[in-house]
């Protein structure tokens, strides 16, 4: 199984300020922006070859009682694979617990799934990019 780092995803109060910071400080490039991605503004920026997803807080999101800061900050990190369903089988065989089974609902119609790591950390398993690269 060939795993590779895919992206970092921030959830924040001010998407534009977060994107502006990366553009200004690191000379990152905004490669997409959606003012309403499932209820919140969302942007993808490119820093070198690394993608950073930045999303606003959705109206129905509230902090978790165990992790009150979970709604903001680092949401998850993504690991790219060629085939999400095959990777899911491989990971399940090793004891991975899935919080989201493979489904095609990621940005740009990508196949995604999520596994839960210790300390309530989410790891997204994502298929190849369909839209932006």
Task: State each model region's role.
Residues 55, 67-75:
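Helix-adjacent hinge/juxtasegments
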Residues 21, 85-90:
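Short amphipathic alpha-helices within nucleic acid-binding modules
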Residues 1, 79, 88-133:
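Vicinal oxygen chelate
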Residues 2, 9-52:
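Core segments of cupin and vicinal oxygen chelate
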Residues 70, 77-85:
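Mid-chain, well-packed structural core segment of small domains
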Residues 6, 40-41, 75, 111:
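Residue-level marker for the onset of beta-strands and adjacent loop->beta junctions
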Residues 31, 60-65, 100-101, 133:
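A short, acidic/glycine-rich surface segment
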Residues 1-19, 74-79, 129-133:
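N-terminal beta-strand motif that seeds the catalytic metal site of vicinal oxygen chelate
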């Amino acid at each position: 199984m060939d795993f590779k780092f895919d992206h970092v995803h921030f959830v924040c109060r001010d998407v534009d300020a977060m994107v502006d910071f990366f553009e200004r400080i690191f000379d990152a490039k905004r490669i997409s922006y959606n003012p309403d991605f499932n209820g919140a503004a969302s942007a993808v920026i490119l820093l070198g070859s690394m993608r950073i997803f930045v999303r606003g807080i959705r109206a129905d999101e509230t902090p978790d009682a165990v992790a009150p800061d979970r709604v903001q900050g680092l949401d998850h990190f993504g690991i790219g694979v060629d085939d999400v369903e095959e990777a899911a089988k491989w990971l399940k065989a090793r004891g991975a617990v899935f919080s989201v089974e493979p489904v095609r609902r990621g940005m740009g119609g990508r196949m995604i799934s999520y596994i839960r790591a210790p300390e309530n950390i989410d790891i997204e398993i994502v298929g190849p990019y369909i839209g932006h690269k």
